[in-house]
A protein has these predicted regions:
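PPIase-associated folding chaperone regions across multiple families
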Residues: 24-27, 37-52, 56, 63-297, ...
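Positively charged n-region of N-terminal signal peptides that target proteins for export
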Residues: 1-5
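Sec-dependent N-terminal signal peptides
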Residues: 6-12
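Compact soluble domain cores
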Residues: 302-306
Length: 396
């Protein structure tokens, strides 16, 4: 078992180093085929060529990140797990599905790491989420290598975990701690077993590390570059491009996409308001059988749009009932609708008239600026991707 630990330490050290390297990697046909089999389980229609293109595009993305936003390579979010943690989960699943490796090993005693040990060792969770040097040094002195089969101390182990998990560990969740230890241990064992099997298949384990990292970081890097949208992630590339959009570009975009700036400018409407839902339902039935205007006369109800002479425009839209008329389908009687004040209304909206925002309107400027910046970001991305292919000699 000691020999296995030394082997894993050596191999993982090489792969950890590969996480920060930005040199070009040529994937073998065996490696592409291996990943094709893996992707097929989630996307049955994917082709070999599509897999090859994805793997190289991911490699291109990693190099873009290394140049422009290197922090994302280590961790996508300050509160999330490290990239290394995600890579290990990705590879463990890959080994399980493609190699059928059983990572069982001799039982390891974890009784030492109980709730009291965690609380005593870690202390209270820091309010700002950042560890002070004294605690870091203390954790660095606790060696987990005998348990995990790779050279790692407690700080390195905990630093890879998410903020939520770390918080629970500081509160003494020993079962969670042991669970994470076992995950790490099982990965390292599976890793040591996978390497010779993969080597016989013509697959470099370091290449799989890069492939895993590329797949994991792909959405975040593309979002950073402005060609993909990811929640809670801003794109400095888009922000810069948006500032460069000028009036002539906005005008040209407006002329080419005028139809998307069409809006409902005016409607005609009649309606009645009731304190009781039952009365509103009765009125709705009457309006269905006659017409809403006739129902107003028969019931003696005042038209809630009388103050506007039943002709409504966007200037009146601050009123809730006016907004309702604009959102009601043309030539239809609405359902019985509860108002914010707790009353009930029934409305009829008709003769909808449309107009176009002017090129100078704030809505046009905002939407056009966003769209133009995205177009430019996509073009930049495509140009850089093609340059990278030409530079590396990749043929897709």
């Amino acid at each position: 078992m000691k020999k296995m630990a030394i082997l894993v330490i050596t191999l993982l050290g090489a792969c950890y180093h590969s996480l920060v390297m930005a040199s070009f990697t040529q994937y073998s046909s065996d490696e592409v085929n291996f990943m094709h089999r893996a992707y097929l389980k989630h996307k049955p229609e994917i082709t070999i060529n599509e897999v090859k293109a994805r793997l190289y595009e991911n490699q291109f993305l990693l190099q873009q990140a290394a140049l422009k936003t290197p922090a994302i390579i280590k961790r996508q979010s300050a509160v999330g797990f490290s990239t290394q943690y995600h890579v290990e989960r990705y590879l463990k699943n890959l080994f399980d599905s493609q190699l059928a490796i059983k990572a069982q090993s001799s039982l390891v005693k974890l009784d030492t790491y109980d709730s009291q040990w965690l609380k005593r060792t870690l202390g209270p969770y820091p309010k700002n989420g950042q560890y002070v040097q004294s605690l870091i040094k203390k954790m660095q002195q606790i060696d987990l290598t005998p348990i995990l089969y790779n050279s790692i101390n407690l700080y390195e182990f905990i630093d890879a975990l998410s903020m939520q998990v770390r918080f629970k560990l500081h509160r003494g969740d020993s079962e969670l701690f042991k669970s994470e230890l076992i995950k790490k241990r099982q990965f390292n064992i599976a890793f040591s077993k996978a390497k010779p099997i993969l080597a016989k298949q013509g697959i470099d384990i370091e290449h799989l590390y890069e492939i895993a990292k590329g797949d994991i970081l792909r959405p975040s890097i593309q979002s950073w570059l402005g060609i993909n949208t990811m929640m809670h992630m801003q794109s400095p590339v888009l922000e810069k491009l948006e500032k460069q959009v000028n009036k002539s570009e906005i005008k040209a975009f407006y002329q080419a996409n005028k139809s998307q700036f069409k809006f409902l400018s005016q409607v005609k409407a009649h309606g009645a308001q009731f304190a009781s839902r039952a009365n509103a339902v009765d009125f709705h039935t009457l309006a269905d059988n006659k017409s809403l205007e006739q129902a107003l006369v028969i019931s003696g109800k005042q038209d809630i749009y009388a103050q506007y002479n039943s002709e409504l425009n966007r200037k009146n839209k601050s009123s809730w009932v006016v907004q309702l008329a604009f959102t009601t389908k043309e030539n239809t009687i609405s359902a019985v609708i509860r108002t914010p004040s707790g009353e009930w209304v029934v409305v009829h909206s008709y003769e909808h008239q449309f107009d176009y925002f002017s090129p100078e309107d704030e809505t046009v400027r905002y939407q056009a600026t966003k769209a133009i910046a995205k177009q430019k970001a996509a073009q930049q991305y495509e140009n850089n991707w093609l340059k990278w292919q030409n530079k590396t000699g990749v043929i897709l």
